[in-house]
Amino acid sequence: MSRLFRSAYAPTHCFSPVNEDKSARYHRLKRQATIVSLLWSLVLLAGLVWSGLSLALRSLAESVAAPVGPSVWSTGATVLVYVGLLTVINEIGSAPIAFYGGFILERRYGLSNERLSSWMRDQAKSFAIGLLLACGGTLLLYALIGWSRTWWWLIAGAAFAALIVGLTQLTPILLLPLFYRLKPLEKESLRTRLLALAERGGARVVGAYEWGLSDKTKKANAALTGLGATRRILVSDTMLAEYSDDEIEVVMAHELAHHVKGDIWKGMAFESVLILAGFYLAARVLDVLAGPSGLRDVADIAGLPLLLLAAGAVSLVMVPVAHALSRAIERSADRFALDVTGNPDAFVSAMRRLGVQNLAEERPSKIVQWLFYSHPPLHERILAAQAFTTRSRGSFPPRAVGAAPNESHARISDGP
């Protein structure tokens, strides 16, 4: 489930045939880049396992780490060197794909404002963060394998679940500022309106911020990100420049639904279950294939590619299920936004704007939706909003226009 209100799909009547063809080509090429990137990673990991190159990579890591000293420190250093080498190899192989999908296509289709130098800086930051997380996570994982050869998968599953929660909470204060300009929302009337909306929902927020997307993209976006004391409202400058307050409010009401209805926690729980299942399968695969693969034992770092293949297989197989659950959650969030604001016209106009501005694909096929779409197609969302009636608005009265946070007359509940 996406935590951002990403509207990548458009209503039927939004596009001329020319724009429809353009959007279809754009999304087809983006999907192809995603598939090629995935295939590269799979081929790399499988090749390392079946060719025996992973054993050679481990020997190289051991030779580099040998001067560290005592065995326990040397083992940890070997893990770090191995992960570093594997990450660099993967990055080198995937760099052309990332450049094509993340820079070339965005500029070719008129969606990017970003200079090449800025894009490369962001890539370097992403690589550094990914390397840090990979090294820390793998070091923890192999420490647990060494500590308990039988139950490491269960303990690791719990540890990584805690890591997901921590990263979700820290994203708005540590990660987002590394890539985007964030400043307090200056438009007082809109800020008051959005804070009132959050208060009615019982979602404590630390403030409302302008999210500087225009340095990088022409796309619009909004989010309610973080947990607890780090939760904050984000509205992109690209959205502030083009959308009415009513449209922004209904977009944010959709985001609020994910927090009020516990969708964020549901998503993290689902991810944690997938990780646990992946680790369990990896443990069984390592038990069976460690010897035939030439590994010393299940704690041999040379088995990392095999572990990643087994664990990743679970997530890959479950992609259609994850997307189906996400689409159901997004439909529920749309209904919540309509109930809370009582403004289907603003919802429809916001969807249409997002569809055009973000170069949405008009009508993706069922198989494409099944494999790639975490949100319902936008024409479906618009039809649902157009069918919205007073009788379907439930027990959530809309906020009085202009009400200050302490004047809101209704508190949003989780609903049915």
Predicted regions and their residues:
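Polar-ligand-bearing catalytic/cofactor-coordination segments
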Residues: P11-V298, V317-P416
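Short linear segments in intrinsically disordered or otherwise low-structure-confidence regions
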Residues: R3-S7
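Generic N-terminal initiation segments characterized by hydrophobic and/or small/turn-forming residues
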Residues: M1-S2, T12
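Hydrophobic alpha-helical transmembrane segments of polytopic membrane proteins
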Residues: L308-P320
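Loop-to-helix entry region at the N-terminal start of transmembrane alpha-helices
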Residues: A299-L308
